[in-house]
């Protein structure tokens, strides 16, 4: 099975797309309840920061999601069970980034707005709800006796880690 730990992030529309593609193989996906959820707001902000700094980024919002979580603006896998919680989390995250972007030059604000131009929040919420059939919430300790091997998601960027990897980070 594949496991997303509390130290990684997932983007529900991508999980939905991958789950639909792999459905015939009946993949087993387990997610820690505190795995962080990446939103389009995280992705847009990540791209804005990357455009300013030019450090190298995959542009998928990983760093922004982790930083947002450290700033105590949370959205976890466990929240995906409740539509009203998803909506509340998205509103909080949108407000969080709006306040950060409002302090930036006009060109940065425009770039952020452009990144969000085609965002469909209803589709994002629908993706959050529709991925339920592709995963189970579980802590690794609960699964250790059931499986001998796991594929841990989220380790692909280790060589871009600013302390352990290679330039560009």
List PLM regions with ranges.
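Non-transmembrane, aqueous-exposed alpha-helical and coiled segments at domain scale
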Residues: 1-169
């Amino acid at each position: 099975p594949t496991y997303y730990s509390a130290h990684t992030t997932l983007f529900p529309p991508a999980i939905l797309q991958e789950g639909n593609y792999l459905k015939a193989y009946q993949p087993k996906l387990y997610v820690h309840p505190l795995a962080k959820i990446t939103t389009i707001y995280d992705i847009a902000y990540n791209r804005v920061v990357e455009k300013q700094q030019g450090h190298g980024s995959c542009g998928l919002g990983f760093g922004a999601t982790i930083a947002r979580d450290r700033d105590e603006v949370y959205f976890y896998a466990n929240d995906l069970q409740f539509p009203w919680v998803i909506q509340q989390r998205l509103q909080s995250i949108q407000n969080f980034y709006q306040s950060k972007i409002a302090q930036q030059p006009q060109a940065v604000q425009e770039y952020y707005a452009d990144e969000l131009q085609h965002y469909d929040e209803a589709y994002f919420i629908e993706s959050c709800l529709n991925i339920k059939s592709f995963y189970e919430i579980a802590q690794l300790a609960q699964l250790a006796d059931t499986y001998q091997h796991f594929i841990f998601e989220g380790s692909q960027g280790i060589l871009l880690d600013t302390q352990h990897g290679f330039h560009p980070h």
